[in-house]
């Protein structure tokens, strides 16, 4: 009975450890044992002590070893999909007022590619417009700053590709640099109504006015004077920095940045031409002006963006007020800090310029292209974003959380393959006649996928260097006695029950004569580790982009011939 209880405890300890990141809990395992073997309660004290021993043994194993042993001995324990709870979003305020015809927008600046942080507003806005409500999702490129946030010509298409991969297709697309006449028309309406004026004072002069609590003297000039100044801005009579168009607000507003904020400025596009319009325009709207106009003109009903835009919302409300427009409902969510991943666009850009990172898809980065290259699935990013939701506080998320979501989707998809990392040792096989044939399970949870046959004539295999047991089971080949310090393997039998009875470690291997030399690239902080090794022959048949699991190593994505990108364990 003790042997049976120990095996039951081992099964549940492994399952518990695999489910919860490599650490099984005694109380959870005890309850599972008693549920499966009720009569064990008669010897509860002894059973608890036995479970403690088993849990200690299991927790000393690596997560890869735990999963490997569980899949070999009790594959049914892995057949159920891992459940990772994902919270859903609350309804939008004001959605009923528009009859559920919610219109949202995702408005990236095409000065760089998207990263995990920018995926959050894309998913949230898409989810509300298309999943929760029968609405419209707009993609709007905000590219009206050709000097300080100069657009990358290739970023427009790269962002489109990222959004398609992410699963957030858009209903309509707009590019702000193509809508300049719309902004000019609204600007002139504001000037004529006395709600905007052209200011020719320097920054120092403006600061002095504000420090003294005085309004800008330019604001007292009649609209006709400001229309003349506006025409001079458009005609090029004012050089860069000589004049700006300001929106009238509250000169005594407690936030100085809100006081008569700048709506348009002159930029010398002969020196810094726009990648789409060249030097056609010299007078460019600021973010807040173009954003306010477009949100109204495009019928946006709800604006979901980061809490850093709270002040921008205050500024934009003045445009709505002056024009007699109804503002959209604004919702500000907190930042999402993903620990262990580089997300800052400026840091990434500088790193690439200095040669610290190879490209925008360097596997150490948090760009969507880098995550895709690593094998992170868009479904996992969705789950992470929906889990964090729209709460206003800053969310600190571990990269392990993203991996847990990804594992949920990847585990049933990824077939299992054998890969022996270096340093590997060569062992000769005794007791089997050539040619030797092994049948390896493609996926332990899906027996209908069948087995792969590995046939080789030379009785030599690569083994992991940490093989130390007196007996082992080579996956799909059989049970062996380890002799001469591991340089020889003496065939015993191919009886799975024998392996279970003797609790043999399950070992991955590769035939020496037909193994595939390979390397696994793994992001490790600011470095990239390279794990070289030997894989089974069928690895050569995997196409680029295929995602598989290397037994005892982790999930990988095929990069190309003999190169694999490590995803996570």
From Swiss-Prot:
A GO BP entry: amide biosynthetic process
SUPFAM superfamilies given in the database record: Nucleotidylyl transferase, Ribosomal protein L25-like
Reactions that this protein is recorded to catalyse: tRNA(Glu) + L-glutamate + ATP = L-glutamyl-tRNA(Glu) + AMP + diphosphate
Keywords: Aminoacyl-tRNA synthetase, ATP-binding, Cytoplasm, Ligase, Nucleotide-binding, Protein biosynthesis
Motif 'HIGH' region positions after renumbering to this chain: 108-118
Record's function text: Catalyzes the attachment of glutamate to tRNA(Glu) in a two-step reaction: glutamate is first activated by ATP to form Glu-AMP and then transferred to the acceptor end of tRNA(Glu).
Organism from which the protein derives: Thermofilum pendens (strain DSM 2475 / Hrk 5)
Cellular compartments per GO CC: cytosol
PANTHER family for the chain: GLUTAMATE--TRNA LIGASE (PTHR43097:SF5), GLUTAMINE-TRNA LIGASE (PTHR43097)
InterPro entries attached to this UniProt entry: Gln/Glu-tRNA_Ligase, Glu-tRNA-synth_arc/euk, Glu/Gln-tRNA-synth, Glu/Gln-tRNA-synth_Ib_cat-dom, Glu/Gln-tRNA-synth_Ib_codon-bd, Rbsml_bL25/Gln-tRNA_synth_N, Ribosomal_bL25/Gln-tRNA_synth, Rossmann-like_a/b/a_fold
Protein name, entry field: Glutamate--tRNA ligase
Main location (coarse class): cytoplasm
EC number: 6.1.1.17
GO MF entries: ATP binding; glutamate-tRNA ligase activity
Domain of life: Archaea
Subcellular location: Cytoplasm
Family of this protein: Belongs to the class-I aminoacyl-tRNA synthetase family. Glutamate--tRNA ligase type 2 subfamily.
């Amino acid at each position: 009975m003790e042997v049976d209880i120990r095996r039951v405890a081992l099964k549940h300890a492994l399952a518990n450890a695999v489910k919860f990141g490599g650490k099984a809990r005694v109380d959870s395992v005890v309850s599972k044992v008693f549920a499966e073997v009720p009569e064990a309660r008669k010897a509860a004290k002894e059973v608890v002590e036995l479970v403690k021993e088993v849990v200690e043994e299991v927790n000393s194993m690596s997560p890869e070893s735990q999963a490997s042993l569980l899949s070999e001995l009790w594959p049914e324990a892995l057949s159920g999909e891992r459940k990772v709870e994902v919270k859903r979003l609350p309804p939008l305020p004001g959605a009923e007022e528009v009859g559920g015809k919610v219109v949202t927008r995702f408005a990236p600046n095409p000065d760089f590619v998207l990263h995990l942080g920018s995926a959050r507003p894309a998913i949230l806005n898409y989810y509300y417009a298309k999943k929760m409500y029968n609405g419209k999702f707009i993609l709007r490129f905000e590219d009206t700053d050709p000097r300080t946030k100069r657009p990358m010509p290739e970023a427009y298409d790269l962002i489109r590709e990222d959004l398609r991969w992410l699963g957030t297709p858009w209903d309509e697309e707009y590019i702000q640099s193509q809508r300049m006449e719309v902004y000019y028309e609204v600007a002139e309406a504001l000037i004529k109504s006395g709600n905007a004026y052209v200011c020719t004072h320097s920054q120092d002069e403006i600061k002095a006015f504000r420090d003294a609590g005085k309004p800008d003297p330019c604001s007292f000039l009649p609209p006709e004077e400001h229309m003349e100044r506006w025409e001079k801005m458009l005609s090029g009579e004012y050089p860069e920095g000589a004049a700006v168009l300001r929106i009238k607000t509250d000169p005594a507003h407690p936030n100085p940045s809100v006081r008569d904020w700048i709506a348009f400025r002159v930029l010398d596009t002969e020196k810094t031409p726009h990648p789409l319009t060249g030097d056609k325009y010299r007078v460019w709207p600021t973010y807040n002006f173009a954003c306010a106009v477009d949100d109204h003109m495009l019928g946006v009903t709800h604006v979901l963006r980061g809490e850093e835009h709270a002040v921008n919302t205050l500024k934009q409300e003045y445009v709505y007020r002056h024009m007699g427009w109804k503002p959209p409902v604004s919702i500000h969510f907190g930042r999402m800090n993903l620990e262990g991943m580089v997300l800052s666009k400026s840091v990434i850009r500088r790193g690439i310029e200095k040669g610290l990172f190879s490209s925008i898809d360097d596997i150490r980065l948090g760009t969507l292209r880098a995550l895709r290259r690593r094998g992170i699935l868009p479904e996992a990013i969705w789950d992470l974003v929906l889990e964090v939701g729209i709460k206003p506080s800053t969310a600190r998320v571990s990269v392990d959380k993203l991996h847990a979501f990804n594992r949920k989707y990847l585990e049933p998809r990824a077939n299992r393959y054998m890969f022996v990392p270096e340093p590997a040792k060569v062992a000769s096989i005794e007791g089997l006649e050539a040619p030797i044939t092994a049948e390896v399970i493609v996926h332990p949870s899906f027996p209908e996928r069948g087995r792969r046959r590995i046939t080789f004539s030379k009785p030599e295999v690569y083994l992991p260097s940490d093989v130390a047991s007196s007996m082992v089971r080579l996956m799909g080949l059989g049970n062996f006695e380890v002799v001469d310090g591991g340089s020889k393997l003496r065939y015993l039998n191919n009886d799975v029950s024998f392996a279970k009875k003797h609790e043999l470690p399950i070992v991955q291997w590769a035939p020496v004569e037909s193994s595939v030399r390979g390397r696994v690239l793994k992001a490790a902080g600011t470095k990239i580790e390279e794990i070289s090794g030997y894989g089974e022959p069928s690895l050569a048949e995997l196409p680029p982009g295929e995602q598989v699991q290397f037994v005892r190593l982790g999930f990988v994505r095929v990069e190309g011939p003999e190169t694999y990108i490590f995803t996570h364990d």
